[in-house]
Structure formats: structure tokens, C-alpha cells
Regions:
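N-terminal core-binding DNA-recognition domain of tyrosine recombinases/integrases
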Residues: 12-25, 34-111, 126
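Basic, Lys/Arg- and aromatic-enriched nucleic-acid-binding interface segment
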Residues: 99-151, 155
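Catalytic-site neighborhood detector that most strongly recognizes the C-terminal catalytic loop/helix
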Residues: 114, 171-175, 213-215, 277-302
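Short, basic (Lys/Arg/His-rich) helix/loop patches that form interaction surfaces
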Residues: 129, 225, 234-275
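Conserved tyrosine-mediated DNA breakage-rejoining catalytic core shared by Y-recombinases
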Residues: 156-192
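Short, polar N-cap/turn motifs at the start of nucleic acid-interacting alpha helices
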Residues: 160-166, 246-248, 268-289, 313-315
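DNA/chromatin major-groove-contacting recognition/catalytic segments
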Residues: 181-184, 193, 290-315
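Active-site/catalytic core of tyrosine-dependent DNA strand-transfer enzymes
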Residues: 183-247
Length: 315
């Protein structure tokens, strides 16, 4: 017999498990999807039988009319699908063929997040005439110079990751081992952001003064602190863009996408870009592609930096 609130209970159980594993970011996404769908259904106790093909279709239309972007809608739908499939595997939900067939679960590549070379040059090199914005500019510049490193990875770098002139770390999102050579142009910026916090036993000794080193790695308080730091960085990045008179929208993703777009424009193979970003795959072809040496990836990174640094509008 199916529980009347089985879908919600299944979701909450999985969200709780993610939190116990310290996967607070993933748990947060599932929680948002569940909250949104529950609100649409008009109840906090959604049953599996309420998850129908027609209701999902209408829910997707509702999200679109609320102004959500296709990729956000897709994320919600994929979270709901994952929860439903867990219910099916547990024998708590009926198997319904093509249940999510009428809703969007792809990735809209039209939602471009990269800046043009000219805008990127302004963002990273023009004087914002503000110490607060200059610090934001330094963080953005390091993200770009570290092969389009994500803000999450940059903020969570520990001092032990810096091995002479190479950063060695595991990506926060995928746990993929990464190595990035520190270019000479980054050394001064590293010193400016260096964290002087005293290390605390069993707590991360962060490299940069972005997060406090007084919380254990999987503590939910540490996740909340990171979310606060991310919001602050995004807000200040927008302030920086306004101060430099940029018209394009910017966010923490902008530097990562702009690094990849710059490399693609320069003719760098997609396989090299994927590996430099720490992506797990680029379709099935990457399964048999040889890994690129650090030296090769460093040359790509140097080329990207030189291209943007020396870029001049109207050339």
C-alpha cells in the first residue's frame, strides 16, 4: 500500500542522508525542488500518486510562467525524477513509463554565462577605484588564472594544497583530483588574500581569507558560511561590473565559463578544456583520451591569460 505522503517522506529521508554525508549543497538543491513542488501541489505531504505526467507538465509550465530559467526548471525536474525513482526502487511508488517525458530535463546551452574578451579584460584589469571592489577583482582574477576554478574550490583551498608552484586539490563538486600550476602573475594576489588564521585541530586550514577556519569540513554551519560568502562575492562582482560599466550579467560562474570560452576561441581542443576544468566527461570520447600533462595545461592557461591581458578593444 502506497503511503499518502510517500513522495515527501522519501525526499526528506534522502535529504537527511545527504546532510549526514556532509553533502549540504546537494541537499539544498533537493530541498528547494521539494519545497517548490509541494507549494504547487498545495500540500507539504505529497504522495507518489500525486506525481502524474499531467501534473508534472502543468508544474513545468507554472515554473516557466513564474520566470524561472530553463536550466533551473530542468534542475527541479531532475531532482523530482530522482526522488520518484528512489521510491520505485524501494517498492513505495508505482513504475510509470515515460513519467517525465513531457517536461524539460536537459541543459539549455543558450544561457550563455561567458564574457567577451573585451569585457573580461575590463573586469580583471581596469581599476575599480575601490579597495572593497579591488579585493573582489583579485578573487575573480585568481579564479581565471587557476584555469577557471570555481568559487567553491577557491574558497575551500587549504594551505596544504599549495605545493611550491603547483596547487593540488580535489574538486568540491566531483572530488576529481586537480593540479594547477601557479603562474608568476598570481603570486602577489595569493599573498594579498593569504589567510593568517591560526589552525584549529580537525578544522581546515584555509589558504585564503574567504572562509573561517573554525568549523569542521562537513559541519552544516560551514556550508551556511560558504553560502553567505558566495552571495557576498556575487553581489560584489555585480558591483564591480557596474563600476567598470559592463553591460553583461556576471556571477561566480562567469569566470569559469569565460576561461573555457576563451580557450575554445583560441582553438584549444575541447578535451583539453574539459580536463583543465575538472569535468568528469565530455560525452563518451573522453573515456579513451589520454590525460594531458600539467605542462600542456599550463601552456593553455598562459595563452588564455596573455590573450585577455593584452586584449584591446577595437584592435
Amino acid at each position: 500500500m502506497m503511503n499518502r505522503n510517500g513522495f515527501s517522506r522519501c525526499a526528506e529521508f534522502y535529504i537527511g542522508r545527504l546532510r549526514k554525508e556532509g553533502r549540504h549543497s546537494t541537499a539544498h538543491v533537493y530541498k528547494n525542488a521539494l519545497f517548490s513542488f509541494s507549494k504547487y501541489c498545495g500540500t507539504s505531504n505529497v504522495s507518489f500518486r500525486q506525481v502524474t505526467r499531467e501534473r508534472l507538465r502543468r508544474y513545468g509550465q507554472y515554473l516557466y510562467e513564474c520566470g524561472l530559467k530553463p536550466n533551473t526548471i530542468s534542475t527541479y525536474m531532475r531532482m523530482l525524477r530522482s526522488i520518484y525513482n528512489r521510491g520505485v526502487e524501494a517498492g513505495s511508488a508505482p513504475y510509470v513509463p515515460r513519467l517525465f517525458h513531457d517536461v524539460y530535463t536537459g541543459v539549455d546551452v543558450r544561457q550563455k554565462k561567458a564574457l567577451s574578451a573585451g569585457e573580461l579584460h575590463k573586469l580583471l584589469y581596469e581599476d575599480p577605484k575601490s579597495e572593497r571592489l579591488r579585493r573582489t577583482q583579485i578573487i575573480a582574477a585568481l579564479m581565471f588564472q587557476f584555469c577557471g576554478m570555481s568559487f567553491a574550490d577557491l574558497a575551500h583551498l587549504e594551505k596544504s594544497a599549495l605545493d611550491q608552484s603547483v596547487l593540488r586539490y580535489n574538486r568540491i563538486k566531483t572530488k576529481t583530483p586537480m593540479s594547477v600550476e601557479v603562474l608568476d602573475t598570481a603570486r602577489g594576489m595569493i599573498n594579498q588574500l593569504w589567510s593568517n588564521q591560526e589552525p584549529i585541530p580537525d578544522c581546515p586550514d584555509y589558504l585564503f581569507d574567504i572562509l573561517c577556519s573554525n568549523k569542521k569540513r562537513k559541519d552544516e554551519r560551514a556550508y551556511r558560511e560558504y553560502q553567505s560568502a558566495l552571495r557576498r562575492f556575487n553581489n560584489r562582482l555585480k558591483d564591480l561590473a557596474r563600476a567598470l560599466r559592463l553591460n553583461s550579467p556576471v556571477s561566480s560562474y562567469t569566470l569559469r565559463h569565460s576561461w573555457a570560452t576563451t580557450a575554445k576561441y583560441r582553438g584549444v581542443p575541447i578535451e583539453m578544456i574539459s580536463e583543465s576544468l575538472g569535468h568528469k566527461s565530455i560525452k563518451t570520447t573522453q573515456i579513451y583520451l589520454k590525460g594531458f600533462e600539467l605542462r600542456e595545461r599550463t601552456e593553455v592557461n598562459k595563452g588564455n591569460l596573455s590573450y585577455i591581458r593584452n586584449f584591446r578593444l577595437g584592435r
